[in-house]
């Protein structure tokens, strides 16, 4: 029998992915017409394999946290079970165990907008098993016309009043509740770049995998308005995995207002999100002062000046609009204050993304999707000055900085292979990687295999 421990990580991931896809694809799929109107329990599964390659590129210089100029390959594999039960009237309990493995490009350094929304789950070439989610969702109906909720991952089919309140408590992701978008949200099925799964400047509180403990309340109104508020735990140390449980002391707060509308008979939504974090982090001005006072020392001086609790905040706009039944467009824009180091997401202080997704009905492939997006990421003056002086941050630091906004173009084509199974080709182009005009441009090409049932 072969020794799997001796297989290279990528080879083991491919073998595991193929086995998972064969099992999942062979499982009987329920036809849409057979979908139940009401469920008292749910058991669903997903598996996603992503492989990406980066050709070599040129750079005038490199630093400790630069993207490597040599050719590289990255991969991730995740497999998740989504279990749920309707425990009482309006009460739903969900549990998601997950397995993940993978290896990033350049040890996950050298970019602002990263290339794979799954990469934070990858902890190396050996499979890691962990609890991804464990939460309670309680719904209170407030009267009015009834509407049907379709079954999905972590969602059971049923009926609710159009006017209702939802409380979610437990272990989940901020992005499970906030900043939804029909065309740019899920890196397992849509765009892969971090700046297309949420605002790149949204430094939302979470552990290194993107999850935490907390609560969120949502009020859905019959007139199309939705109001959301929530608080989540963050990491004990910025960007690390262990969670800080002191949710009354260190936390991330967010509030979001959503309005549904129609333009030309086509649906759309507008969302405004504000957030505020409180945690022990370093300010870039303190880090720059320390760097200048200690020439020749460790340039990652943010680690030396985490000397007190800081506040970080931002505000963003999220728009989605259907053009017709096959084409939709989106826009996200956010500005953060940028005075302190990254708490839990990535090195972006201002972000803009816009794009669209087109279903393949026009060429006889109704279940296929083609998407294209443009992104622009910027840094605050404080972070920019620190990096230009030779400072090293958590994800970026070239030793110098010829500052320009980081610009990204992303395109994908998702091809339905079997029911509930898709193969996606993805391409991303990065100009001024990590905001440095002296490096790049960089291209990353990817393939994704995804199935769920």
Regions found by a protein language model. Give the residues of each.
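Short loop/turn motifs that connect adjacent beta-strands in outer-membrane beta-barrel proteins
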Residues: 32-41, 55-56, 84-93, 141-164, ...
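Residue-level signature of outer-membrane beta-barrel architecture
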Residues: 85-87, 97, 138-140, 171, ...
